[in-house]
């Protein structure tokens, strides 16, 4: 094998490895996005409850949020985990309130349970 052939073979190998990594990352991102849509649809299924609790449901890429005048609940989806947070707007010094509670979960059902717990904590 010549030096050129060895170089070309190495470059092809690296390109193939890069494509595998990119495909895996894209698949992870698509799964995270699908799970965020799933949680959003579960929460959106009861608009009466959201209105009763003065919650505004929002979704952006990988994030589902519940906004209330006094607090913010969020679920952020990344690498097959869900970071669920609660933030108190009443004591915030800036527009973006820092999370006061945080829990990592693995499933949409667990995220729903933690959001319900955080909502109960805020409304008791």
Task: Give the ranges of each region predicted by the language model.
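Short, mixed-charge, low-aromatic patches
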Residues: 1-4, 67-72
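Hydrophobic "lid"/C-terminal helical patch
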Residues: 115, 119
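Intrinsically disordered, low-complexity regulatory segments enriched in Ser/Thr/Pro
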Residues: 70-113, 124
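Negatively charged, low-complexity tracts enriched in Asp/Glu with abundant Ser/Thr
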Residues: 11-68, 99-102, 106
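Short intrinsically disordered terminal tails
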Residues: 1, 120-124
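Short linear clamp-binding motif
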Residues: 1-15
